[in-house]
Structures are given as C-alpha cells and as structure tokens.
A protein has these predicted regions:
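Conserved, mostly hydrophobic/aromatic
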Residues: 24, 57, 92, 134, ...
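Structural signal for hydrophobic packing residues in well-ordered secondary-structure cores
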Residues: 138, 169, 173-176, 180, ...
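Glycine- and acidic
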Residues: 151-155, 159, 216-222, 331-334
Length: 376
C-alpha cells in the first residue's frame, strides 16, 4: 500500500491524499459503506459501483467468520470474488462486535470467548486466529484485534484494556509475519489506538501505535456513546501524534457533521452503519438537514427526494411516493433511502476533498455544519 498526501488545509488539519493498493486507488478523505456480511444491505453491487461509487467498502470479520465461514470464502477465492466486488475492501477485526456481545463473551489475556448470536455455539477469537481469518477473508486492509472499552468506563479498566490491546497487537504482528498471503494481492495491516476518553491514555496509546511503523493507523473506541465534543477532543490528541505520512482511520464514525469535524482534525477514513441503518428506518440525510420521510408532512409532497440529484433515485421519485413505500412496508422504500444516503455520504467526503485541494475547506465546513444541523 502507498499513501500520498496531496494537500493540507491552511485553516484546519484536513488532508487530501490517495491510498493505492492492488485493487486500486482510494481518494481521501473517504467514507466506506459498511457491507457487514459481504453485502451493503439492500444495494446491488452494480448500483454500488455505478451510482454510489465508493473506492472501498467494509466487511466484518466476526460476521463473515460465522457465515458464510472461512471455508466457503477460501473455496470462493476470497471475499472479492465471493461478492463480485473488484475494488478495495477493509475488514475490521471483530473486536467491536465481540464488545457489543457483552452478556455473551469473556475477555482474558489469551483472547475472547464468545457465544454466537446465531446458534449459541461458543467460539474463541485470539490475535493469532483473527489474523488467519482475515488472511482467508482476503480484504486489502486488515485490522489488529483489539478490545473496545465500553463508555463510560473507569480509568483503571481503560488502562488495563489499552495495555492488553497493545500486547495483542504484538501477537498480531508476530503471527501475521508467519501467515502467508492466500491470494494474488497484498494486504495492509492497521493497528488501533485505544484509551477510552482519557487524554493521557489516548496519548500513550497513540505514541505506542506510531512506534510500530505500520502503513496506516486506526482510532477505535470512540462513537460508543460519548458526547461528540469528547470524541473530537480524543481525536485531536491522537492525530497530533500519529505520523502525518500514514492514513488515519476513525472507526465507526459517524453523522455527516461528525465526519466533517473529524476531517478538520486530520482524519482520512471513516465507516458507519448510519446511512444504511437510518435509511432503512426512513431517515434521509441531505446537505440542508435530515428528513424523517415517515412524517405526515410528506404525504402529499410531490417534489423530488433531493434536488441536488447526487444519485439517480433523488430525482426519480417524490417524497410522497417514498413515504408511501415506508407506510406500506415495501422493501423498495428502504432500498431507495439507502442508495440516497450512501450517495450523500460519498458526495460529502468528495466535496470535502475538493475544498481541501482548493484551500477553502474551513469556510465550507463551517457553512455545511450549520446547514446540516436541521430537521426538515
């Protein structure tokens, strides 16, 4: 993998760059649609490629390990061939999913024993086998196995958790060196900064992660319930330390406003289920605020979904029609909302990139944050 920094904004820490892997170029800042189980929910790969057009999508190690299983993925020739997606894929390590199974998992030094949400069977994730699983899945960018501390958590827990994440990272690196590639392209490994919402722990973790010298770095354990201002504060502490010549990935973030504020702090990569999940529940994101399409006010609004016409669905259907589809629980409504939201998120980061390159990102960001902070 190669990262080339093209421009840095003069009034903020925002950056524009390119990440080049064997599956193509990723222009940053980038938003990665979440394809948890090998699909971006409700979106054909053709629509994803032609209409939404992301350079990279995300898959989830925990879910892909359970279904379809690594046996099937290896037989298929890896995740790209299995799902017919020839662009970049990033897999998270499953650490967050295991964290979210709090009642059904046990964390110890060796790894995490957890109970499958599907059939109740028991499984063990260790730094070693998670590296093997990710080799078999075959994503272009793979993540370290970490523990995501809950929010809130006390200082001592956060400290113990951070140190264990660092020890697990050493085991990930050692085992990755011994585990050959399965397919005919390279994989890039990102370690993860932890430390909850404690500045000194975030600083300590960022310094340790920076010292590893990986090709890119991630920030985990944020957007787990803490106030947005705390998230920004922790991000600022970490981006000050992480190397400037490597991409920085803020995991699981976030709202359109969260994304712009974190781009301004020097983040390059984002993923979040919000555009797809909220879309399936009738929430649309636009440049002028959010729309709850289920509200009665849209029942006879025959204007197009979004006059900005970012994706073809925006002008193909009216708000009244989309509301009708949700009212009668028609799956097409969820698909339209999902395509719209993902198209908007990709438009937003691409506009951010344009303004970073043009040198006026700070002014544009301030205007957009005000505009988007509305309910229409």
């Amino acid at each position: 993998m190669q990262f080339d920094l093209k421009a840095t904004d003069t009034s903020t820490l925002a950056r524009a760059g390119t990440i080049t892997t064997d599956h193509g170029v990723i222009e940053t800042p980038i938003f990665m649609p979440v394809g948890t189980v090998g699909t971006v929910k409700g979106v054909h790969q053709r629509e994803l490629e032609q209409d939404i057009n992301p350079d990279v999508i995300l898959g989830n190690t925990y879910h892909l390990y359970l279904r379809p299983t690594t046996t099937i993925l290896e037989k298929a020739g890896g995740i790209h061939k299995f799902m017919n997606w020839n662009r970049n894929i990033l897999t998270d390590s499953g650490g967050y999913q295991v964290y979210s199974l709090s009642a059904n998992r046990k964390i110890k030094e060796e790894g995490v024993k957890f109970k499958s949400h599907i059939d109740g069977s028991y499984h063990m994730f260790t730094p070693e086998n998670v590296m093997e699983i990710q080799r078999t899945i075959g994503a272009d960018i793979i993540m370290a196995f970490d523990e995501c501390a809950p929010y809130p958590c006390d200082y001592q827990y956060a400290k113990r958790s951070m140190h264990m994440t660092h020890r697990w990272l050493e085991r990930c690196l050692t085992h990755l060196d011994k585990t050959p590639l399965k397919y005919d392209y390279r994989q890039t490994f990102f370690p993860i900064v932890q430390g909850s919402t404690y500045k000194d722990l975030r600083k300590q973790s960022a310094e340790y992660i920076a010292s590893v010298g990986a090709e890119g770095n991630a920030i985990g354990g944020l957007s787990v319930g803490e106030p947005a201002e705390e998230m920004y504060e922790m991000t600022a502490v970490v981006t000050e330390i992480l190397p400037k010549d490597k991409p920085r990935y803020l995991m699981g973030v976030g709202t359109p406003i969260n994304i712009l504020e974190n781009i301004a702090l020097g983040i390059d990569m984002f993923d979040c289920v919000m555009p797809t999940r909220n879309g399936r529940n009738g929430m649309l994101f636009t440049a002028f605020g959010s729309i709850n399409i289920k509200n009665k006010k849209w029942v006879d609004d025959f204007s197009e979904i979004d006059s900005m016409n970012i994706t073809w669905v925006d002008t193909a259907y009216s708000k009244a029609y989309l509301r009708h589809l949700f009212t009668v629980n028609e799956m097409l409504g969820r698909q339209i909302a999902t395509i719209h939201n993902l198209g908007f998120y990709l438009w937003l980061v691409r506009e951010a990139r344009k303004h970073i390159l043009a040198g006026d990102f700070g002014v544009w960001k301030s205007k957009m944050v005000k505009q988007m902070d509305n309910r229409l």
